[in-house]
A protein has these predicted regions:
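Hydrophobic, well-structured mid-protein blocks that either form specific transmembrane helices
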Residues: 99-103, 115-116
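Short, charged low-complexity linear segments at domain edges
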Residues: 1-16, 109-129
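Electron-transfer interface patches adjacent to heme c in soluble/periplasmic c-type cytochromes
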Residues: 1-9, 21-32, 39-98, 108-109, ...
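Extended cationic-aromatic binding surfaces that line active-site or macromolecule-binding grooves
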Residues: 15, 19, 36-37
Length: 234
């Protein structure tokens, strides 16, 4: 069951409208987009993402797959979509953010079940694991330094212990989430990008292989978590 009074629920309805609406230069909806279970089949689809897609010959997470469909089916420009995917704080949010929340909400109550059956999925997982533990950048920092033990915090913010099963499951099951400080829905791509910024690393390119690798590692580690979006974050 969703938490009461979560403003993020408004974005679910917005995303649903956008999904079924004919838009873009090709005046098409996203009803033929295949997120892994077949064209237009959304229930349970995000529980298995990231996954390998033969048509792109890539491992893709929800957001990169969504951009692929918006380009191929609707005719939107890839670079424009990527540029606008993460909305400014205090705005009404982006189409991609609303769509990502709606599609994920169709898996609410279902368990994460990410597979590593394809060699490219296995490779992506290994890269993500390496990145999670690798110290880098001007501060010589790694994800695990914030999220590798219990009872850590930055200022007043508790940090989730993501090398524990319970901790990583809490993360992967609650994004996209409504971010109270921004008054808008945020996605996993935003969460990773913001972490990179806080670690003073080079900007994380939206839907890049790096971001998908980290998501693959985290989502596989979180298998068994029950999806419950939108989450609510400070």
């Amino acid at each position: 069951m969703l938490a009461e009074d979560n403003p993020g629920e408004l974005w679910i309805e917005q995303g649903k409208t956008l999904f079924h609406q004919k838009r873009g230069p090709k005046s098409a909806s996203l009803e033929q987009c295949n997120f892994g279970l077949g064209p237009g089949k959304l229930d349970g689809a995000t529980t298995q993402l990231p996954r390998y897609f033969p048509d792109t010959d890539r491992v893709q997470d929800l957001e990169s797959r969504l951009v692929t469909c918006m380009v191929q089916l609707q005719g939107f420009n890839h670079d424009d979509l990527v540029k606008r995917a993460i909305s400014p704080a205090g705005s009404n949010g982006s189409d991609v953010e609303a769509l990502a929340l709606y599609i994920t909400s169709r898996s609410n109550g279902m368990k994460m079940n990410v597979s590593l059956s394809h060699p490219k999925e296995q490779e992506m997982y290994k890269v993500g694991e390496y990145l999670f533990f690798r110290r880098s950048g001007q501060t010589d920092f790694a994800c695990v330094q914030c999220h590798g033990a219990a009872d850590k915090r930055i200022r007043l913010q508790d940090l989730i212990h993501m090398t524990s099963k319970q901790g990583v499951q809490e993360v992967v099951s609650t994004w996209p989430a409504y971010r109270g400080a921004h008054f808008v829905v945020r996605t996993m791509q935003w969460r990773l990008s913001d972490c990179f910024w806080q670690m003073r690393l080079p900007e994380l390119k939206y839907a890049s292989e790096t971001s998908i690798a980290l998501t693959t590692y985290l989502h596989y580690q979180g298998n068994g978590a029950v999806v419950k979006v939108p989450g609510f974050k400070r």
